[in-house]
A protein has these predicted regions:
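A short small-residue
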Residues: 1-5, 45, 105, 144-153
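N-terminal beta1-alpha1-beta2 submodule of the flavodoxin-like/Rossmannoid cofactor-binding fold
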Residues: 1-79, 84-92, 156-162
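Glycine-rich phosphate/pyrophosphate-binding loop and the adjoining helix
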Residues: 29, 136-162
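A generic structural signal for alpha->beta connector loops
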Residues: 32-34, 103, 133
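Rossmann-fold NAD(P) dinucleotide-binding segment
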Residues: 87-103
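Short, glycine-/small-residue-rich phosphate/pyrophosphate-handling segment
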Residues: 105-145
Length: 162
């Protein structure tokens, strides 16, 4: 089984990436699946102009990202909440593909520095994923107060709480 974890923030000083690292480590240590982080900060996709299938000369990184999604048995999206929504980098990546998302099992981890763990982003992300035909796991994983609960290496500071 192969799982892709999308680390969606490209922000300087991002904290949500810590959770991508945490889940990768957890899945590997428990031998649950082959796992890879697809870090949108590394891809740096240009602003969306056209879906991949309609691009005349798509960049290699775009084709590689699409192949990772297609070849994954499931996807975990790790996203911060920005003003009640998810970052433009994630919207850009979602819109870049279309058929690749259809019937793809997707779960998401929402992250915030506040008390609610990105609860507001759940609605907007869920709606976008439903519209493209993804199969969304009905149990998001909200992470509140990320700075108090995880470090930059993706380690839980309170192991009893994870």
């Amino acid at each position: 089984m192969k799982i892709s974890i999308i680390s969606s923030s490209v922000r300087i000083g991002r904290k949500s990436h810590w959770l991508a690292l945490y889940f990768k480590k957890y899945i590997e240590e428990n031998k649950l699946a082959e796992v890879k982080i697809l870090d949108l900060n590394e891809y740096q996709f240009p602003i969306f102009e056209e879906r991949l299938k309609f691009q005349e000369a798509p960049e290699e990184k775009t084709k590689q990202f699409a192949a990772e999604i297609v070849n994954s048995n499931g996807v975990i999206i790790v996203t911060p909440e920005y003003n009640g929504g998810y970052p433009a980098s994630l919207k850009n990546a979602i819109d870049l593909l279309h058929a690749e998302w259809k019937r793809k099992p997707i779960s998401f981890v929402t992250v915030s520095t506040g008390m609610f763990g990105g609860a507001q982003v759940t609605t907007s992300l869920l709606f976008s994923l439903w519209k493209i035909g993804a199969w969304v796991v009905p149990a998001p994983f909200p992470v509140p107060k990320v700075i108090e609960n995880f470090n930059e290496k993706g380690e839980a500071l309170d192991k009893e709480a994870t």
